[in-house]
Amino acid sequence: MDQMVLLTQQWLNKTYGDKPGFGSVITDGNTGWDTINGLIRALQIELGITATANNFGAGTTRKFNQRYPHGVKQQSDSDKSQSNVYSIIQGALWCKGYSTGNDITQNFYGGTGNAIKELKNDMGIGGDSTVTIDVMKALLSMQQFVLLKRYGGIDVIRIIQQTINRTYKDYTGIIPCDGLYGREMNTALIQILQSLEGYSPDDATGNFGHGTRGNLKTISRQNASSYGKWVWLAKAVLNCIRYDCLQNENWDDDFAEQLTKFQKDYKLPVSGALDVNTWMSLLTSKGNPDRAAKACDCATVLNAQQAKDLKAAGYQIVGRYLTGYVGKSTSKALTLDEIKNIKNAGLSVFPIYQDGGYYPEYFANPNQGTVDAQVAISAAKRIGIPSGSTIYFAVDFDAYGYQLDSMILPYFKKISLLFNSCENIKKYQVGVYGPRLICSKVSKAGYAKYSFVADMSTGFSGNLGYAIPNNWAFDQFNEFSFQSRPTFALDKDAYSGRDKGIAKFDSVTKMTKGELEKENIKDKVNIARTQFVYDVVEPLHLLNQLTSFGLSYN
């Protein structure tokens, strides 16, 4: 608990508790959105806004600029006038950890002025103690302007953030200077690109659309001296995704080496230049959707002609589902006849499991990982998936951090446990499908060998500002209608070569309906038995150990 944050909360409730549109804030001494939103509503009341909202939007901006066209100025020592706006500024400073040297007052003297100067220096913009609209918006936010090293912040990214604020804030506004690369900074980097392309601040939205793509410059060592700011931008992105290079406007040998490494790692054409493919992969998760791909995936049961057409189009490996339906009646499951079509066409397969997984509630069931692991293993064995193959389990939504920790990781933990048990006689491996953050977290926890990255969703918070996982095998980047007989929906996937897929299947006999029903009953018994063992072992704090050795029981 912070005493000054507590005083700020108490001051807000005392001053505005009886004002329409304010409500109250929690008085716990902890900075959070509840307190920040209270400060925003307080400012709106001071600006004469009756329909208050927990948002510093266009209306609040307009009213602030009308009242303070040149910003909120520090008072002279002889000026004894008072204002609650000064108190709001002080409270916001305390919430960000900046001392005004005094309690909450209604004056804006030297202590508050020095705190504003310190804040502006941390932002990278420097200057006097005037609180401009950009500074006010930053104050009334959860943005941080000191290095958050314990959360992974690094100095070079913070320096880049400060440079952005100092040089491009008319386009980007004030962005955090915490040393972390995330959604807000990724958007700012696209806005910088748009500024270099000649967009006005109002038109530089941070959305990488057709216009932004059409105005890209191809830059190489030969013409780099004419495009120094473009080189600086490319270096900034590379540094953000941990391709370390000296942050300046020069095309040096170190930058050339890191650029080539990036192109190789992302399986882009290695041009050694900042071309369309490279720019788009630097700044968006899906990159250039029109680039060629060696892998693909689909929910269509492929006939012989479709498989041949895929091969003729340059695809080498296709992702197919082990089970499930499109809608309520159209099967998307890989069949024995389809395997013949795929093999005859000269294609390989990588198997995907998804019978849900596109909404959070699916993962709330603590037994779901056990169920899915058992069903996937049985389905894979039935169609001849050979030993050691990787099966990709899907997380097909933009999970927040708390959902990742409370549902997604426990789900994959249960999958990993069953894959390490005697039930997995084929020694199948676990793969993960999802946004970059999910793939990275699940893999880092030791629950997945390879990642199948859902990079088409460029707006996912789990993709924005994150590098592609080191263990990526497939990178899904574009969906389109593939022309064949008949035409079908196809996803293009970049292919790293880590997972070779399946070219040779085990020989199996097609099951009758009765045999399938018996197999399903057996699966249900195995699921119940396995979950019973987990329920017994988990209270003994032994469950984590079971991921490192094979579990068997009778």
Where in the sequence are the language-model features?
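Cell-envelope/ECM-targeting effectors and their regulatory/trafficking segments
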Residues: M1-Y325, N554
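Structural recognition of the beta-strand scaffold that forms the well-ordered cores
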Residues: V85, A92, W230, V237, ...
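N-terminal catalytic cores of peptidoglycan-degrading enzymes
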Residues: T278-Y359, Y450-S457, Y534, E538-N554
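Functionally critical loop-and-helix segments that line ligand-binding/catalytic clefts
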Residues: R291-C298, C439-Y553
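Aromatic-lined carbohydrate-recognition surfaces of secreted/lumenal glycan-active proteins
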Residues: K294-C296, C422-K441
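Generic structural signal for well-ordered alpha-helices
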Residues: A307, I339, A373-I377, L409-S416
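Substrate-binding cleft of extracellular glycoside hydrolase catalytic domains
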Residues: S329-A399
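Active-site cleft segment of glycoside hydrolase catalytic domains centered on the general acid/base Glu
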Residues: A399-E423
